[in-house]
Every structure is written in C-alpha cells, then in structure tokens.
C-alpha cells in the first residue's frame, strides 16, 4: 500500500502537501489523465461526505483504483467514470465513509473468538451455577484435555445473583483438573483457580505488586481475583493460539469489524507477540482492513533496541501507530484513579478509596520521553481525573503543544474535569471518548459519584466548543462492537435505567458520525486519507439501510450495516 505517513512530522507534512496539490487539479481532467482501470459509480441514495460542521451530501461518488476520484452530481460522475464503469445503485440506502475505530482490541477479539464467551446471548449467565455450566459446555465443545488451559472472556461479576465474584474455591471445586482463567469484561482483571495461579507462580504469600489489586478472604488467602498489575503474571502464562486457531480467529475478528462497517480497526494494547503475529499476517496478505497497533509501554525496551521497527507507516494494511501507556484502571470496576473517593469504597470494601495509578508519574514521564524522542505518538489510557492529571503533567514535561502537532491521544478521558479541557486545548490532545459508558455503566457510576460528575463523562459538546478533535470508541470487547449504539449513546446519553446523564453534552447525528470518521482519522494522522468522501481519499465506505440524519434518536440503534467497502472492494455484505 502507498504510504502517506512517516515517523517524521516533516516528511508527513510534505506528503500531505503533495497530495493536496495533486487533488486541487480539476476533477475531470485529472480523472481522465490517470485512468487505468474501470471505475465504479455509486449513486441512488444519500451520500454523506462528512465534510464540514453541517450535513453535507452529494448525489454520486466515483471510485477508481481504490480511491475516490469524484464526488458530486450524477451526470458529471458518469462522464468521469466512463462508459466502462460499473454502476452501483444504492436503492435508497445511505453511503458514508467507512468507520474508523478510535479504540478497541482487535487481538483480544481474536482471543474472544477462540475462547469461551461468557456473554453469549443464547446462554445467559446470571449466577455462579450458570457460569460454571457455561464453562463446562465450553470445555466439552473445545475438547480441552485435563491439565489444559480454559480461557473464558467477558466475565461480569455484576450480573451474578450472589452479588460477589466467583472465587478460586468455587472454580477449584468444579474444575480440579483444568487451569481456569476468567477475563473480566473490562480487560482490567481476571479470576483464576489454583491450578492457573500455580502455573503463574502465584502463592498466598505473593505480595501485591505496585499498581495491582488482589482480593483475599478473611484468613488472608487469595481468592483468585486479580486486577490491574496483579493480573499480569497470569496473562503472561496464557498460551498463544496455535497457527490454525490464529488464522481462524483472524478471519473471524476481521468479519466482526467489517460486518459493523469498520474499514480501520485498532489493537489498543498490543503485546510483542500480538505485534509480530499481526505484522506477519499483514505481510502475507491476510488482513483486508487497515489495522493500527498500539504496543504497550511494557514493550518499549524491546522496541527501542530494534532498528527494523517502523512506526507510522503501513506494511500490508498493518501499522504501528504509537506507544500505549495505561495510567489507571476501570471506573466501573473501581480501579480508575480519582481525586475524589468512590462512595462504595475499594473492590474489597475498604474506605476511603480513590483508586491507584498503574505506574508512577516519574516512570510515565521517563518512558514517554523515550518514546517521544523517537517520534512515536503517545497514547494514554486514563479514566479517572487523577490519571488525566498525570497524563497532562507528562505531556507538559515533554513540552508538547498544539502548535507542535504531536497529537497525544488520551483514551477514554472519562471523568474529565472542565479545567482539563483547557489543558487538552493547550497541548493539542485528542480525547478518545467512550459514550457507551453513559448507557452501560452510568448507573454504576452514579452510585459512586455525584450526578454532575457523571453528567460530564465523555464531554463531547464541551470538547468541540474548546476546539478539540474528539473521537468515540467501543473499547470492544468491553462493550459490543456496534457503531450504531456508539452513535445513539452519544446522542441520547441515557443509562440502562433511563436516566439521562449530561444532556448538555449530547451530539447531533452529524456530530456523532464525525466521532466515528473524521475524529479518529485525525487522531492517527490519517485525515488526508480517511474519514470523508472527497477526491483523493481512500474509497472506504459503509452502506446503511437508513440515513442516521433523518432517523429518530430512539431508532438509531436499529440501523443495519448493508455493505462495507475497503479501497473499492467489498469486504463484507449482508447475507454473506
């Protein structure tokens, strides 16, 4: 693939200037000059260009060689497309730029596809016996032999009637011969049985690591519940997928993204193993959508010693986009780091509890400086306002400014204070917000924090007013990979119990679609290639059965994906 991004900002700017000049040439003359293969003409329905602050539509778009060569009137489009063009009548369906994933976990989706799914809608789990039954079914279906690892995903203790975590003792009684690991749906913790603990070298005398949370029973014995840094020893022992499993999981993960209209996906916390496997898959031509990888800060020492590692440019549809730092945990699991205490206390019940940072300010500053010195973009996970303070202090230590255009991204930025928006504006931070929290988790948040604090989570409207470039993400598999739910939640901000949180932060449909297209494209320096329908952009499209701009808010979630097109080629269509 032609590379438009380089590690050096100077080179990136030169590329962008060159393409801006190229596409300033008159459409028809340029299109005829470079005609090399039959074009495709799309027409017959609303085409949302996503250009500008107000709704902007055209009647037709022409694609040739994977790029858009014209967007405008049908008659002119036919002249430019030529007599050999293939015509695609939308039949009233709506076409817009392919969705750009602002943050999710592609590699984790591969694992979920190959593991036991604890949120299977056909087998709902509502108590510990039904959870154990689901694990037994998973073991039998996968024919996992005694002594083998059983990895289950999407574990949610809040759904259990017992109102507690399943424990090591529960799992030992049911599965004495397997190594059991239940990955919490937040991705920030897990529960294991004794066999898995032993494999990870964890005993009851193992101390709690800095930035880690372990739960113990009244006798001081570990319950098998580990969060944040305490979970890493177990994560590191989970065996990798076999080549056959990896290929099947890769195909399934791509299908899930493409079927939801995404032409650009992200692995937001890549290990070295993830990075190597996905780069190899890209080089083998196995990846059909664009995939941005964010290696975690734990990989930094290894990456700095490798001259072959390239950031910012695609290799077979895969690129290393930047380094990911995780400063805190999850507010719904009460592991996010706050300046104010949680009303419900710590996960083990003690008070006062503000959460804890996953790394020190000094460590973050030092490692971020090492990455920044190589020209690598900085991505930071920060949910609580205290963690966001840490991110801002680190950026200031690096001397980052909006003018420098380093575009640090703070993923989640959930419990942001108004004063922190001013710092984001000064530094040039791109906030990757998470509006699904207002639906899935706001009721939990309101039990811990005041209504005004919860009303300011994912403050889209305030961020736009401050001149920022926000995006919206699902953090899948934390919440479903469903862009229409993302759009709806950014417009409605309504919780599961019907409470509206922060009505002044609601977006219009047009603004909400920007958070799924232009916003995330800008955050990864791809605004010259993706996110809009105009000449020079990649022909990345999603086709919807209804127009979000004319669909009532309450019906937004019912909008269906009909087709996903990557660089002019259909990579998924309904009914496949």
Specify the residue positions occupied by each region the protein language model found.
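Acidic (Asp/Glu)-rich catalytic clusters
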Residues: 282-284, 309-315, 424-426
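Boundary at the C-terminal end of the N-terminal hydrophobic targeting segment
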Residues: 29-33
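Beta-rich accessory regions
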Residues: 567-569, 574-575
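A generic structural signal for residues embedded in beta-strands
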Residues: 70-71, 152, 541-544, 573
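Bacterial N-terminal signal peptides
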Residues: 16-28
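Divalent metal-binding segments
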Residues: 35-43, 48, 52-306, 321, ...
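N-terminal secretory signal peptides that target proteins for export/translocation
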Residues: 1-11
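His/Asp/Glu-enriched, well-ordered alpha-helical/loop segment
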Residues: 368-379, 386-408, 412, 418-425, ...
